[in-house]
Amino acid sequence: MSLDTTEKQQLINANQTHGTDTGSVEVQVAMLSERITKLSSHLQENKHDFSSRQGLLKMIGRRKRLLSYVRGKSEQRYNGLITKLGIRG
C-alpha cells in the first residue's frame, strides 16, 4: 500500500527537521510507519496475501534498523520520534 502525494507531503511537513528536509531519518521512519499501518489493515482482511506479508516484514525490519541508528546517535531524538509516532509502548 503506497502513500499518495498529499499524504507524503503531510508526513514530511510534520516530521522534517528544517525547511527543505525530505529524507532525514525521522521522515523516513514516519513514512514507513504509515505504510506499515496501511499494509497491516490490508493483511487483516486478506490473510492469504503472502507477498504483501513479506513486504510488510521487510518494512518493519527497515524501520527497526533506522530506529536503531537514531537511538545510537541521540537518545533524545529517538524518544521524541517514538512518542510522536506512537509506535512503541
UniProtKB/Swiss-Prot annotation:
PROSITE patterns xref list: RIBOSOMAL_S15 (PS00362)
SUPFAM superfamilies with a match to the protein in the record: S15/NS1 RNA-binding domain
SMART domains listed in its UniProt record: Ribosomal_S15
Keyword RNA-binding in annotation: yes
Family stated for the protein in its record: Belongs to the universal ribosomal protein uS15 family.
HAMAP family: Ribosomal_uS15_B
UniProt subunit comment: Part of the 30S ribosomal subunit. Forms a bridge to the 50S subunit in the 70S ribosome, contacting the 23S rRNA.
Listed name of the protein: Small ribosomal subunit protein uS15
Species for this entry: Prochlorococcus marinus (strain MIT 9313)
